[in-house]
Amino acid sequence: MFGLSKVLRVGEGRAVKRLHKIADQVIALEDKFANLTDEELKAKTAEFKERIAGGEGLDEIFLEAFATAREAAWRVLGQKHYHVQIMGGAALHFGNVAEMRTGEGKTLTCVLPAYLNALEGKGVHVVTVNDYLAKRDAEMMGRVHRYLGLEVGVILSDMRPDERREAYAADITYGTNNELGFDYLRDNMARSLSDLVQRGHNYAIVDEVDSILIDEARTPLIISGPVDGTSQFYNVFAQIVPRMTKDVHYEVDERKKTVGVKEEGVEYVEDQLGIDNLYAPEHSQLVSYLNNAIKAQELFTRDKDYIVRNGEVMIVDGFTGRVLAGRRYNEGMHQAIEAKERVEIKNENQTLATVTLQNYFRLYTKLAGMTGTAETEAAELNQIYKLDVIAIPTNRPNQREDLTDLVYKTQEAKFAAVVDDIAERTEKGQPVLVGTVSVERSEYLSQLLTKRGIKHNVLNAKHHEQEAQIVAQAGLPGAVTVATNMAGRGTDIVLGGNPEILLDIKLRERGLDPFEDEESYQEAWDAELPAMKQRCEERGDKVREAGGLYVLGTERHESRRIDNQLRGRSARQGDPGSTRFYLSMRDDLMVRFVGPTMENMMNRLNVPDDVPIESKTVTNSIKGAQAQVENQNFEMRKNVLKYDEVMNEQRKVIYSERREILESADISRYIQNMIEETVSAYVDGATANGYVEDWDLDKLWNALEALYDPSINWTDLVEGSEYGKPGELSAEDLRTALVNDAHAEYAKLEEAVSAIGGEAQIRNIERMVLMPVIDTKWREHLYEMDYLKEGIGLRAMAQRDPLVEYQKEGGDMFNGMKDGIKEETVRQLFLLRKQFIKQDAEVAD
């Protein structure tokens, strides 16, 4: 993996030179476009669209379009793209990941390729990590696009389908990865064209691409429906497990995130439940409840892995610290946690539709992304998404100072030192950003700061709504901001305060909204922005004198990239700044990988709790542990993709056929083929032995009569003379006769329905029957595939490759599902024929 990264970087130098040249060419057009009137500049959009309609490609209008958007941004926002931002925009247009340091203006950079690609009229999706950023960027950057005559939409979690449809119809659509992915799944569950909201997957620019395509790639998007009834055993085991003892009744492997029940534990549970054998077939499900209850107790920590809000257990992303709204753990794990927390236990869910983010984003014809830290994942982005990472130079030299890690024996000593350091920094007016790994730790530190009388803001999954306001003020003199991991990522920490966001907050407080009254908002913006910038700049000078933003990490993350992201918040755009990590021997990463060796050494040397050590051994151990975890996570994501690739190919077939049926006015050919293939399959099964006397005609006619009412008597067919002498009937003759008979019987249904409501009526009935059958069979297939995947690992014990077995058996199951769709559809349609006959008989009587 790491060797590939080096190879990828070799070609990067040539790409950067090319981007430098492009940026120079765009800047050379600056005076020409600055001299255009507003009307002339706005007219460029129509001109570009006409040229594209005339046969020109995007690359031919590339430089002029970039120059147009750059000038528009200056007139509307008062911001002009730097040379390096033009380079970043070009990298995005060519379908790369632009690695741009924090504070280099990724949001503004995105305006250029979004405008250019929107000119084709096929839609551009700008993907962010949360609703707030999607709405903010659609409003702020959307002002540039709307000025140039483009429509801008935004997808938010609380929108209705008609609002979503309108947003996707816009030239440029902002939204989160979750909302876009779930809309894709919902579209492929729609029963009519009018229910669809998306219009295709042309070009996506993914902001914080590493967070979305890598950190969240292990968790699939799942739309699920409740399974009837919730088991009482979730509560039963939630009461039993706390009375059990770790390492006596059960064992836990924190590194592998697994649990195992010991013999003493089995005996204890059997005694509590009053049963003789926990592993008896009739009690097999109880083992799953027990394991989940132990995992809920030992491996899932409140305010770290999840939070409880309004009586609901909500998952917290371990990398970003954000709440994963709408997602639930599967296989009963979520219910076990609900039982542990004594909140309402919601029904177990059955998967209705699912897709991984990896496969969702590979739907796009062109994909690009932006991030501040992609170098460590360059190989993965290339292997899985075919994306090259190009490091864009900074606008000014980086002045950040990364101080040596300080390691303490205990958590208490570490946090005491952290508070002392924060107090010292704030006294001289230096702003401090503190990174924690969980909601629990952020709130613990908040309590310590409150006791010391240090004013601060907390930014975690519980305070998600105030994210932008808190981050906008995190660069003020003496400000202290405590954040989980990368909560607040996507919003710049500007020394002295972020003038654009602070002004936006101020204008909204006065009732001005850029969507509802763009003219009034723009007028106030233009009038007040210079004063706000000056005020922030004056405060920023004071902060620079105090040393710039100080970033303090309270624990190393298992991914180096997350640590680098935290450090990257400091020293933006050539500002001064410094960073330091405070560690303890009881930190999760240290416990899992460094082990007791270092702690024993500190004890032998009689190192006091409040005295830190600076050790190369510790630093190297941490780096080794992080590299080990990164490799494990990469392999896990590759493994997820390998297994999902089987489902992905099947999903593409089903969704493609489903969409074709939705869009076709006449699906009679599908139905005719289904009739022929179903009847043929029956005949093939009955005549497999070859000789007429060996055919299982009783079985064949029983199957046919369950399907429809054959008008042919099989005795006449076999013994009659229609096909020559008695006994000369071939399997092909039988198939032809029965297929023709089934078609003739179906024609009677078509005739009967058409007589009532015209030919369109039978076509509508066919669609109304077929779509639910497809959805039901697909849902059942997803369940069967989940079940197959759960047990497929056991095939390794028989010296067989689990993946190969999964591919083979999954393929067989998929073919069986398709046959089931045909058979059930034909059966239901012929059932309508029987109902018509019954009605006719009743009328005759």
From Swiss-Prot:
The keyword Plastid belongs to this UniProt entry's keyword annotation: no
Keywords noted in UniProt: ATP-binding, Cell membrane, Cytoplasm, Membrane, Nucleotide-binding, Protein transport, Translocase, Translocation, Transport
Membrane topology recorded in Swiss-Prot or TrEMBL: Peripheral membrane protein
Annotated Gene Ontology cellular component terms: cell envelope Sec protein transport complex; cytosol; plasma membrane
Binding site for ATP: 85, 103-107, 492
Recorded GO MF terms: ATP binding; protein-exporting ATPase activity
GO biological process: intracellular protein transmembrane transport; protein import; protein targeting; protein transport by the Sec complex
EC number(s) reported in the record: 7.4.2.8
Gene3D superfamilies cross-referenced by the UniProt entry: Helical scaffold and wing domains of SecA, P-loop containing nucleotide triphosphate hydrolases, SecA, preprotein cross-linking domain
Main localization (coarse): membrane
Superkingdom of this protein's organism: Bacteria
A Pfam family matched in the record: SecA_SW
Listed InterPro entries: Helicase_ATP-bd (IPR014001), Helicase_C-like (IPR001650), P-loop_NTPase (IPR027417), SecA (IPR000185), SecA_CS (IPR020937), SecA_DEAD (IPR011115), SecA_motor_DEAD (IPR014018), SecA_preprotein_X-link_dom (IPR011130)
Reactions it catalyzes: ATP + H2O + cellular proteinSide 1 = ADP + phosphate + cellular proteinSide 2
CDD domains named in the record: DEXDc_SecA, SF2_C_secA
Compartments, as annotated in UniProt: Cell membrane; Cytoplasm
Main function: Part of the Sec protein translocase complex. Interacts with the SecYEG preprotein conducting channel. Has a central role in coupling the hydrolysis of ATP to the transfer of proteins into and across the cell membrane, serving as an ATP-driven molecular motor driving the stepwise translocation of polypeptide chains across the membrane.
Subunit structure of this chain's protein: Monomer and homodimer. Part of the essential Sec protein translocation apparatus which comprises SecA, SecYEG and auxiliary proteins SecDF. Other proteins may also be involved.
Family note: Belongs to the SecA family.
Name listed for the protein in its UniProt record: Protein translocase subunit SecA 1
Organism of provenance: Corynebacterium glutamicum (strain ATCC 13032 / DSM 20300 / JCM 1318 / BCRC 11384 / CCUG 27702 / LMG 3730 / NBRC 12168 / NCIMB 10025 / NRRL B-2784 / 534)
Gene giving rise to this polypeptide: secA1
